[in-house]
């Protein structure tokens, strides 16, 4: 995995050219920990036929979002019809239940029936809208079947936990409707109408955002990956941090942050980037449990890394009614603190173990990296287009896709061929299935909450429970987000939390932006929080470590993700909200950085040298003090951490003098 000094191209080809057995092992890991990878196997002409359908879907999404401005219900129902069609083509009835070039008769029926239900709505949207609650019996049957087929597809590609949430809410909604009208048919009719035929259900805000923005950016990410930018990111990270103590771990942090931003998948990025970085970390001297944890924590953070954040960020922009560029800017400081926290932890671990960095022979030359800097052009163009606000997000994404294709053709080491273009469009469609289905189910969940008025009930209950103790409200919200996020995709988790918990925080007095960022962050960290820490378990499998210990280490490394949301909740200036002065923002960030350093040192048991339990507790306490708003708490925290630092500095000096 090292770069030859006589051939710097090797540094950019780190992840390419994997032998067939290694690639097979990685694919097996993906299937084990990433539900999206448990797909049917198509070979021969069938593989190309299915791929062609996927390509048509991607091209349809690009074309329709750019040029179609008709009835929203029509385009969203047609979008879900295609999602159902390619979804059943892709996902078998259960994990491992796959035969090559085989699709059972019942899957064909489900695919055709489900697609027909959504197409019926798409072609008859206007008359159905005019009928409103006066829909006929056949409308109810079609809508009910469409919902059931969508639920089955969700079970296959998203998972059961989100369906448990939906099931509980559907039962509650049914009884709620019966309280108004004792007729079972009328209750069912009302539920089907609101959840299938209105924008308070499957074609609600989540699916609208998915169709309008998310799918385009998934396709953009697929093209960007095929330009060779991931290899460039790893090589760049090697050049920037490989030389320092424990360099490979820092390389993992930087490269995973950059690659995770493009891939948008915690597990997927852990497996792909980790196949390079984890062996490097182990070779340097890091314990397997720690190496897997570093990769998992850094890959998970890719979803909060501007400018291309996770799919939930687009939903957040829609829910807050803010431009995506504004959301990305507000995410900068929390993301910096998150990755700085991981960086500090791996540095302290390296110092504690006495690890060295990579040699010059193992790092690429700056001259070669500069030759490949054009690979960043699509990202730079996207940032410029989005931040300028001159064009729509759809236009920005489409132009950036075109730029990625051009850049791919220019990269002679990993040139973008027509086959790769086909594969990128195919991968974009596959990536859209899970997100689209999750958004549709999240729309139904949000619809149930809206129809029943459950949000108001929950808001009043938690506000009364927490009273004036806003901190308790934050803790309750955090627990809800993490527990739900353990089995629910980030997009669906955010939609549910934005409909329930975010309004609670807003009613308690927290700013709108802070409330939504709070639930967004804690929905993401579930991927590294035991017992269901899928990204950590994937990292553990590559490192051949203990899954639970890897998960615990990943949680420790990502401690900033558990603390930073509380900081910006009480000090929203970190999100550029209610900013009184530039100095106020600088002060918040500096105290947060020192606080993260203190907590990381306490958890690692090392600052300038190994420390005992008392010093570790003092560091953690001091770090938390620095994160609590207020000059007094900052002063106390600074004194505590500074005291430990001074004592260890003197101890090191004495030890050096005694040796001399």
Walk through the language-model features, giving the residues of each.
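Membrane-water interface regions at transmembrane-helix termini and the short interhelical loops
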Residues: 39, 64-68, 90-101, 127-128, ...
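Membrane-interfacial loop-to-helix junctions in multi-pass transporters
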Residues: 137-141, 200-213, 239-253, 284-290, ...
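Transmembrane alpha-helix interface/packing and boundary motifs in multi-pass membrane proteins
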Residues: 221-225, 256-265, 297-303, 446, ...
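Hydrophobic transmembrane alpha-helices that form the pore/transport pathway of multi-pass ion
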Residues: 234-302, 308, 312-315, 321, ...
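Conserved, well-structured core domains of diverse proteins
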Residues: 1-133, 140-144
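Core transmembrane alpha-helical segments of multi-pass membrane transporters/permeases
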Residues: 152, 156-157, 161, 165-182, ...
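Membrane-interface helix termini and inter-helical loops of multi-pass transporters
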Residues: 68-69, 126-133, 189, 193, ...
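Long, contiguous bundles of hydrophobic transmembrane helices that form the permeation core
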Residues: 2, 7-48, 55, 329-431, ...
């Amino acid at each position: 995995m090292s770069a030859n000094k006589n051939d710097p191209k090797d540094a950019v080809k780190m992840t390419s050219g994997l032998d067939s057995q290694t690639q097979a092992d990685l694919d097996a890991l993906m299937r084990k920990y990433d539900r999206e990878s448990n797909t049917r196997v198509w070979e021969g002409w069938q593989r190309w036929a299915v791929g062609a359908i996927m390509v048509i879907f991607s091209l349809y999404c690009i074309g329709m979002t750019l040029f179609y401005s008709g009835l929203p219900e029509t385009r969203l129902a047609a979008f879900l019809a295609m999602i159902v069609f390619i979804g059943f083509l892709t996902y078998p009835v259960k994990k491992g239940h796959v035969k090559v070039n085989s699709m059972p008769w019942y899957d064909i029926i489900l695919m055709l029936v489900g697609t027909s239900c959504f197409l019926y709505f798409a072609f008859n949207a206007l008359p159905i809208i005019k009928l409103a609650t006066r829909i006929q019996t056949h409308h109810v049957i079609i809508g009910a079947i469409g919902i059931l087929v969508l639920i089955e597809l969700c079970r296959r590609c998203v998972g059961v936990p989100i369906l448990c949430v939906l099931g509980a809410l559907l039962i509650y909604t049914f009884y709620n409707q019966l309280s108004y009208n004792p007729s079972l048919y009328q209750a069912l009719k009302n539920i089907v109408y609101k959840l299938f035929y209105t924008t308070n259900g499957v074609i609600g805000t989540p699916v609208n955002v998915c169709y309008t923005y998310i799918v385009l950016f998934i396709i953009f990410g697929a093209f960007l990956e095929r330009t060779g930018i991931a290899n460039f990111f790893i090589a760049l990270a090697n050049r920037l941090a490989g030389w320092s103590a424990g360099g490979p771990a820092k390389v993992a942090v930087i490269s995973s942050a950059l690659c995770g931003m493009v891939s948008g998948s915690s597990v997927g990025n852990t497996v792909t980037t980790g196949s390079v970085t984890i062996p490097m970390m182990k070779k340097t001297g890091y314990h397997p449990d720690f190496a897997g944890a570093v990769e998992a924590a850094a890959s998970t953070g890719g979803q909060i890394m501007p400018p291309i954040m996770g799919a939930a960020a687009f939903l957040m922009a829609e829910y807050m009614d803010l431009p995506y560029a504004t959301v990305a800017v507000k995410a900068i400081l929390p993301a910096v603190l998150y990755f700085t926290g991981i960086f500090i932890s791996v540095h302290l671990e390296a110092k504690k173990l006495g690890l060295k960095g990579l040699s010059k022979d193992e790092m690429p030359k700056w001259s070669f990296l500069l030759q490949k800097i054009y690979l960043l052009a699509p990202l730079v163009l996207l940032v410029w287009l989005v931040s300028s606000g001159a064009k729509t997000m759809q236009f920005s994404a489409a132009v950036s896709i075109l730029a990625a294709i051009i850049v791919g053709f220019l990269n002679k080491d990993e040139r973008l061929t027509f086959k790769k273009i086909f594969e990128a469009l195919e991968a974009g469609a596959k990536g859209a299935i899970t997100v689209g289905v999750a958004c549709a189910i999240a729309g139904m969940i949000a619809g149930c909450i809206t129809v029943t008025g459950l949000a108001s009930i929950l808001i009043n209950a938690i506000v009364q429970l927490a009273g004036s103790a806003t901190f308790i409200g934050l803790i309750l919200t955090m627990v809800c987000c993490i527990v739900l996020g353990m089995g629910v995709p980030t997009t669906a988790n955010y939609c549910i939390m934005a409909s329930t918990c975010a309004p609670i925080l807003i009613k308690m007095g927290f700013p709108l932006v802070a409330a939504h960022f709070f639930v967004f962050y804690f929905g993401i960290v579930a991927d590294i929080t035991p017992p269901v820490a899928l990204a950590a378990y994937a990292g553990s499998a590559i490192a051949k470590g203990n899954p639970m210990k890897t998960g615990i280490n990943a949680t420790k490394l990502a401690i900033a993700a558990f603390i930073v949301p509380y900081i910006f909740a009480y000090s929203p200036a970190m999100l550029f909200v209610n900013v009184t002065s530039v100095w106020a923002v600088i002060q918040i960030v500096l105290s947060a950085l020192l606080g993260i350093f203190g907590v990381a040192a306490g958890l690692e048991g090392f600052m300038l040298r190994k420390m005992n339990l008392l010093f570790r507790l003092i560091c953690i306490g001091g770090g938390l003090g620095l994160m609590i708003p207020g000059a007094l708490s900052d002063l106390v925290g600074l004194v505590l951490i500074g005291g430990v630092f001074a004592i260890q500095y003197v101890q090191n000096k004495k030890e050096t003098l005694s040796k001399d």
